[in-house]
Amino acid sequence: MVNHQLKVVQALASALTAGGRGVSGTAFPKQPEKSLKLYEFEGSPFCRRVREVLTLLNLDYEVYPCPKGGAKYRKIVKEKGGKLRFPFLIDENTGIEMYESKDIIDYLFKHYGKSGKTPKKYSDYPKYPVVALVGTLINGARGVWINQKIINREAPEQLLELWGF
């Protein structure tokens, strides 16, 4: 119970550090017909940026965790994109497969945002994501280090649903 409470406090502190990004969503979002697929790892500040925008746009998406040392989904990214770089987004609705958080964010607003334009708050990210990095550190840098306890854990039989942000 204490571990869970600590994670809740970490998540809140991380969200507040980022100026509240990732804590609200768009009403009546433009949902894609097929779920978007995001290959990412939790500790990456660049992946964090994409997750914040997916939350803001209130989009349903599938997350494929690719922590350091993980073998399950990293090979798919390498096969499809040619390199191990994260985040990696696949949108089967448009046939797009892409790297680079800034490009992904612009793409998401263009195709699924209300105006089709990336708001200034999300287009003017600094090159080095200091604030997002602080959020990663507050959250214990999960996904940055190899966790031997979970490295070969089997995937669940069906996708898990997360409600919240």
PLM features: residue spans?
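GST-like domain detector, emphasizing the conserved glutathione-binding G-site
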Residues: 1-165
